[in-house]
């Protein structure tokens, strides 16, 4: 997964 996607997932 892309770094940006991981950050958004943790933001949830």
Swiss-Prot record:
It comes from Pithecopus hypochondrialis. Expressed by the skin glands. One of its GO terms (biological process) is defense response to bacterium. Has antimicrobial activity against the Gram-positive bacterium M.luteus. This is Antimicrobial peptide 1. It is found in: Secreted. GO terms for cellular component: extracellular region. Keywords: Amphibian defense peptide, Antibiotic, Antimicrobial, Secreted.
């Amino acid at each position: 997964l892309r770094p940006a996607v991981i950050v958004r997932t943790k933001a949830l």
